[in-house]
Amino acid sequence: MAARADNVSRVDHDGVTLVEGATHDVRFAFTERTGGVSEDAYSSLNLGSHVGDDPFAVQENRRRTLEAIGAAECEHNLLVPNQVHGDHVVTVTSNGADDLENIREQIAEGCDAIVCTVREVPVMLCFADCVPVVLVAPGGFAVVHSGWKGTIARISAKACQALCEAAGCQPDDISAYIGPHILGDEYEVSQELMDRFASEFACIDAATSRMLDLSAAIREALMDAGVEASGIVDTKLSTVRQNDRFYSYRNEGGTCWRH
């Protein structure tokens, strides 16, 4: 059975504010905008290296984030994938230097979820409206980037399956955490896309609305994969309404950093 999945709180670490939790000896966090060194209107804790920010600022922001979560000594093992809005999942089962270098080559080619079953390997994915999903089980964890393409492809369920295989656990052992994202009443999409989602997910009603609730679809996919409803926590934090705390690609006109 999954551990209680409601242990998430907002904590300030010398200016770096995290929405964080810990389950099965895995510590995880969703970052906010504050506490970094990036400059301009989108300051300051930008973690994305692909948005035109100073690379040294990004490196320092990532270092501060790891320090805040208690993983500063593991910075040399940090994994940050090239996110491509797909459904490819990469699994990490060794923290050896050569093995991690091989993983870095794989994730540089593109992946949107990383499963990890070894200690001292921090995993960092970047977001600005898309849905962050953290899966935690005895013996491992997964971090998932789920935009609409990944959501309709059920990437969270695929990461769940990969985590179960790698950690030797069952889906009902998993606790799932859905982080800050663009909420269903903020995300208007085309009728064609609504119809596609409605054909895939029972929770999506394309007949009455064009507002797409990605987190509801993710929850359905996880439950279909065997994760218990009681083991799924949605922080219900909005990147749009709470744009002062989180980056929002849509709310900021397509120009923003990444948390």
Annotate the PLM regions:
Residues M1-H259:
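Active-site microenvironment for binding and transforming phosphate-containing groups
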